[in-house]
Amino acid sequence: MNDNKVMNRAADNIRILAAAMVEKAKSGHPGGAMGGADFINTLYSEFLVYDPENPAWEGRDRFFLDPGHMAPMLYSQLCLIGKYTLEDLKQLRQWGSVTPGHPEREIARGIENTSGPLGQGHTFAVGAAIAAKFLKARLGNVMNQTIYAYISDGGVQEEISQGAGRIAGNLGLDNLIMFYDANDIQLSTKTEVVTTEDTAKKYEAWGWYVQKINGNDVDQIREAIKNAQKETERPSLIIGHCVMGKGARKADGSSYECNCATHGAPLGGDNFVQTMKNLGADPENPFQIFPEVQDLYARRAKELKQIVAERYAQKAEWAKGHPEQAKQLEEWFCGKAPVIDWLKVEQKAGAATRGASATVLSVLAEQVPNMICASADLSNSDKTDGFLKKTHDIVRGDFSGAFFQAGVAELTMACCCIGMALHGGVIPACGTFFVFSDYMKPAVRMAALMELPVKFIWTHDAFRVGEDGPTHEPVEREAQIRLMEKLKNHHGKNSMLVVRPADAEETTVCWRMAMENMETPTALIFSRQNIDMLPAGNDYSQATKGAYVVAGSDEDFDVILLASGSEVSTLEAGTELLRKDGIKVRVVSVPSEGLFRSQPKEYQESVLPAGKKKFGLTAGLPVTLEGLVGADGCVWGLQSFGFSAPYKVLDEKLGYTGQNVYEQVKKLLA
């Protein structure tokens, strides 16, 4: 156990660096970082297990920061362990710096997750804890790590905390320890203005082990973490009553603590000078690490070296006795796509693509032992039950199953799956109705930003949901999610792969693309209703190019008909009528516009040559295909919310028939 005077000095060092970073940047959040310094210092100097030489070590503990605005605290702490330089800290929030305004995932520097939107970070931790339990059930104690999370008042207020708290308690995630920085201050007000709930009782009701402490007292923090580590049945919440802006002083030397003004702005001028003096820093040169703090972390580095050496030795001994599991461990954490025998997938002709997806999922459940599939209480409708039928639910005390029942909580489910991907070793997929993807959008964006290969399964893809009516008909959703295909990630690639297959066989190809895509998230959009198969002889492998000419198309064509999903078969019906009038037709299936636009220009031109008349059909907004059709033609799409009626009636009323395709193309060619 370290001397408390040194521990307090180290926490003050973090406070100094955090406040100085924000002051120099003229932007940021110093108050929370100053209040949380005692906890994060205690965690990193005495408890968190990681390998300083191998930051990607799969057996490391994980620390998930929820309030990304407290980046100065995390950067300062990571500076103390050598992951950042003092010069890096000086460049907070600047162009090209490694210290952006909110932390961005970088394992080499000790940052496990990108954080910013409150509530998501601690839910990632719940997902990571599930992944760790899942892997431990298959590999044993070689994966015996602890997942730590840090949450703020704002994160607790976010609705997603309900789902995260419920799931963690229900599953008994005793490997999860969360510190709640309860400083009672937020950006605009004191928390008492917006909430009077008893947070401790709430988490206890969810099945958590809850402790209340002084969040700035080293002894109490230390004891609380030890108690949490001993817990064997419940996740732990440590409610630390912290002082916002601890150590801050006003220009006249009076206290500036517990003041909303310190939350989201630099301390400023003489306030900053007096704060630095109060904390024992040189206001003219605050970017320093005190000698005793350097010694503290040098000792911890030696301790970690010994701890990690013992863990590696245990792993080596385990590998000798469990060669198959050792091989799995290496394969699951290597970042490569799993090997799958796709010939095992036998599709039923004319099936709904959600049903075709179930067929694929049943094979994946058998062939990909590190895959977890989830559903938000819709497994028998979104057909993720194809996976479930080959495994069983993950439940408290038994993580040998591979199906995660998230309950009616789409955003929570998505964030948990992101957390699984962040932990590593697990391939997560989650399903719900396409219309409910609206609930998931913030998480999908974070998955894309972090370049995580989560598979999002969205069914009931258009107005053909039918009788349920406009509340359940995602008319505008395809256009929205395909914007993610146009948005580039920081590696210059499409931030997301979005696929909407035309029939059962194309569904298999789309799932193959999803499973081979280990660089970005994938959206798989499936139909509720049955869909006719594309013409015999169709080369479905061409779907990997995003768009391709469907078999049976005429060589010397007069018009190109293009669509994705179930609309392709409607185009085929219209094509039969057009050919009776002597019109030659090329039909193009476009499961992924983003992927198609990533192909060489020569290929794009060969499929959709400029100057040729084009007709697009989409069950969504016309804008979904307007970029591909351009000035060469027109798009038939839905420009209003949907309606309640049997889907075949809606097809007739809304013009999604072969006859209407025939009539619209005739007008185009007139």
Q: Would you name each region that the model predicts?
A:
Residues 1-146, 301-525, 530-532, 589, ...:
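Thiamine diphosphate
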Residues 154, 183, 461:
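Acidic beta-to-alpha connecting loop that harbors the catalytic carboxylate
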Residues 1-34, 151, 155, 159, ...:
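Conserved acidic/glycine
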